[in-house]
Amino acid sequence: MSETAERKPILDVVGIQKLLPHRPPFLLVDRVVEFEPNKRVVALKGVTMNEPFFQGHFPAQPVMPGVLILEALAQAAALLATLSMKPEEVNDKITYLMGIDAARFRRPVVPGDRLELEVEVTKQKGAVWKQTGVARVDGQVVAEAEFMAMLADRER
């Protein structure tokens, strides 16, 4: 078990739901364990056999779909941007994913794994953020990608 996995969360799933519009079963981040404003976030996702996607992907040999690993990284990236905002701005903004580049999958993620989602800002100009994300299980890279996202006004 990694040092990060044992640390007390900075933000739990209840707090995450106050910041992200996603809800189960599409909320793919359980907690935030490290955060540096405008720089970096580390979040965790416990992968259990109860995940609805395992019913069809694949019943005899369950594997978390790669696109959902990328979505978990994108949600961690959105948390990084949201947590970096001024508190009075949080309820007025939403993060939209604009693009994914250089996505690579290194090994399957299966029930019982704990995804460690690390996202770092590579560039930020105005409302547009460029970030890199790496997903690990037990310290081994399982997926990585580059993301571009934009903070926009929330529709009321």
Curated annotation (Swiss-Prot):
Its main location: cytoplasm. HAMAP family: FabZ. Belongs to the thioester dehydratase family. FabZ subfamily. The keyword RNA-binding does not apply. NCBIfam families: fabZ (TIGR01750), PRK00006.1 (NF000582). One of its GO terms (cellular component) is cytoplasm. The gene is fabZ. Its EC number is 4.2.1.59. It catalyses: a (3R)-hydroxyacyl-[ACP] = a (2E)-enoyl-[ACP] + H2O. The active site is at H57. This is 3-hydroxyacyl-[acyl-carrier-protein] dehydratase FabZ. InterPro entries: FabA_FabZ, FabZ, HotDog_dom_sf. It is found in: Cytoplasm. Keywords: Cytoplasm, Lipid A biosynthesis, Lipid biosynthesis, Lipid metabolism, Lyase. It comes from Anaeromyxobacter sp. (strain K). GO terms for biological process: fatty acid biosynthetic process; lipid A biosynthetic process. It holds the Pfam family FabA. GO terms for molecular function: (3R)-hydroxyacyl-[acyl-carrier-protein] dehydratase activity. Involved in unsaturated fatty acids biosynthesis. Catalyzes the dehydration of short chain beta-hydroxyacyl-ACPs and long chain saturated and unsaturated beta-hydroxyacyl-ACPs.
